[in-house]
Design a protein with these regions (language model features):
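Active-site neighborhoods and metal-handling regions in enzymes and metal-associated proteins
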Residues: 1-134
């Protein structure tokens, strides 16, 4: 949500986070490990110019793009370096790429379940407007 009109730079950043999310979803859905999906998303963010802003502002950046959800809110596996296993069928994960700058933050967050044919979005996903102004 945006208070007032979202400046073009922020729309571009939001679209970048959508692209990162889609890349990570594709990797995980094809059986890649959480670690490889993290690397792919991080590398894409670097290419987009968000090196010092992905998941926080340098040096206070979280080193993950999402986490499993279960009995606890944040569970393993995590979309991060060192989680060298794929999501198994039935695994539920929140995928939440975001960038944070001095003048604001923007990102996406949806929850996905791993199935036989890839990941399925459990939250609003593409059926919800990418951003709303008021």
């Amino acid at each position: 949500f945006s208070c007032g009109r979202l400046p073009e730079i922020w729309i571009e950043r939001l679209n970048d986070m959508v692209e990162i999310r889609e890349s990570v979803v594709k990797k995980l859905g094809s059986g890649e490990t959480c670690s490889r999906a993290w690397e792919s998303g991080r590398d894409l963010a670097i290419e987009m110019g968000h090196t010092d802003h992905l998941m926080g502002m340098n040096p206070h950046q979280a080193k993950f793009l999402g986490h499993s959800v279960g009995l606890e809110l944040d569970e393993s596996p995590v979309l991060a370096n060192g989680f060298d296993r794929a999501m198994h069928e039935g695994c539920i994960m929140a995928i939440e790429p975001k960038v944070i700058y001095d003048d604001g933050a923007v990102g996406t967050e949806d929850t996905w379940v791993a199935g036989k044919d890839g990941l399925e979005c459990l939250t609003s996903g593409k059926s919800f407007p990418l951003h709303a102004e008021w």
